[in-house]
Every structure is written in C-alpha cells, then in structure tokens.
Amino acid sequence: MALDQLETTLKKQWRLGQSIVLCWAFDPNGLLTIVIPHYFLGNFTSPSHPSGDGQKNEDFIRQLISGSRFKAHDEIFENASRLGVAPSFIKLDSPLDTGDASIEMIDEMIKRYSLGHEESRAVALFDIADFSLFRPFEQASQLNSLSYSMNSAYSKLKREGVEVNFARTTTGDGYYVWNRDLGAFPNVDLLTFFLLVLIDNAVAREKSQTGTVPTLRSAFHIGSHYELSQAEGINPTVFSYIVGDVTIKLARLIDTVPPAGIHMGDFMANLPDASSLVGPAEFLRYSRDELLDMSGLRIDEKQLSDIQFESWSAGQSEARLIEVTDKHGMSQGAHNVGFAIDLEGMPLALGMRNR
C-alpha cells in the first residue's frame, strides 16, 4: 500500500519527465526526496556557474547519482543545501519497512525517475555498413540477423556459465550494447560476447545470400556515462538508455572503421583478479582464452578450436595506435583488431587492417 502511494507521488514529482529525482531518505512520516528540473544540472555544472566551481559541481553530482540513491536523513539535507534547493516531503499513510530488501526495492523505483552515472562500463557498438543503400526489406532482414547473432551469443555463453545481462539501444542502423551488471567480470564478459557476436555474424555471412546478413563495422570501449530511464507516454519505463563519454568516443571510433573492421578505444580498466589497470590487448587475450576454454561452445555445429590475432591487431608485433579525429576536431586513440578462427578445420578471418 505504502509503495503504491509512493509510486503515485513520484510520478507526480517527475511531471512527465520535466523533473529528476536525485536521491531519497527515510523520514518518520514518509520519505524525503531531492527533486530538480531537468535543466538544473546543466546550469549547475556549467563553467559559467556563478560559483565558478562548475567542475567541482559536476564531480559532486556524479558522486550523488552513482550507485544507490539512498541517503542518510542528515545527508539529504546537506546535499539539498549544496544544491541550493529544499528537500521534498512525501507523506505516506502507512510506514515503510526500513530493512535492506525494502531499501533496494525503493531505490530501484526511485532510479526510474532519476539519472544515474557510471564511471567505468564496457559498451559495444555494432553498425551495419552501407545500411541506407539496401531496400527496406533487406534493412529489416539485416537488423533481425544482427539481433539473432546477439541472442545466439548470449545463449551460447549462458550454457557455458557466463551470463551477459545485456541491454541495447538502437542507432537506426545498429545498436549500442552494454552489460547491465557492473565490474571487472561484466566488462570483460561483454568483450567476450562482442567477439562471439562478430564470429556468429561472420559465419552467417559465409552461408547467406547477398543482402540478408549484414557486414558490420564494430567498436568496443570502456568509459563513463549517464543512464536515463526512457519516458513513454505518462510513465517512465524499466528500460534505459546511456549517453556520455563512452558513447561519444564510440561514435567517433565507428566513423573510421571500414566495413568488416573492428576498433577498440584506448582505455585502461580492471581485469578480474588483476592488481593494476590494463589496456585493450590484455582484455582481448583474456576474452580469447575464455572462449577457447569453453569446451561445449559450438558455432554452426562446429567446435571453435583456435583464435589467432593478426600481426597488426592490438597488442601484436605490428600494432599501432590509430589517431581518430572527428568533424569537430576532437581526437582520440583507437586500436585495430583482427583475428583468425578455426572451426574444426574451417578457417575464417575477422577484422580489416586500417592503414
């Protein structure tokens, strides 16, 4: 009863997406929230903010909306004072349980009306090459084929004990894909998933007729982003989309990837059980070994028996860092990826050397 009443009030505070609920705390008679207009954060974190502390303000907001939105009673007043706003009080007719399970349930509810920030998450981008040149029916077939490759990769990995809780948003001619779970294992598992999707797609292309299976341009990066729930009609959905440094860099990367090419961003991140940050080459080796250790993994009814990186691929003898510059003059580094697989004697090469 109290949760239903809370949901109704949060929906009113949200005002069809006009406002954002930043955080919450228990109160003896209900709940306290900090609710701001959606434009507030842009002004508060602007370099031209009257305080002159735009960057410090942004760091504060990122910390506030990272992880749980649940705060201590005193803390929510401190946060409101820092923002220059007053907490909102939600009066409930019956008390809420303050146990861990209840906190988690309320937190998930609040997040649908909130904005989140993650500092380090793996994201993949699959882009269908020359998509606009195909007939509408072929476009639909190619998107369906890519979706099937993702679902197939998920199913194969799950059977081997690796569950990639992936989410995706469409770009129109492809998808951004990320792991809903956070941490070193989920990040490298997404790379393993990424490689398996590309292998499944390559095998399908070998067998397909022209136009039905897409030629992909693909990129992978680890970085920070914001996460928002999608607003549909009068309700926020349980589905979300991401935007931020990692998606911006992926968009830059994909512009320089040739058809059938694969790029990785120039990142440093944690691998499971590693004591220091590592780059794309170490991530690739980890995912390759993970795939080859899966004795039950079969693609097109064939055992994946070998994966060898090309000499020009990231971490190999002829590898070099590619400088990518977008139309706005913003530059970043990229790593080319290429590898050959063996499916019970059937060789297949993936990736394109970008000179």
Label each residue range with its predicted role.
Residues 110-194:
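Catalytic NTP-binding/metal-coordinating core of nucleotidyl cyclase/transferase enzymes
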Residues 246-263:
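A contiguous pocket-lining binding segment that forms or flanks enzyme active sites
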Residues 160-185, 204-243:
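Catalytic core of nucleotidyl cyclases, primarily class III adenylyl/guanylyl cyclases
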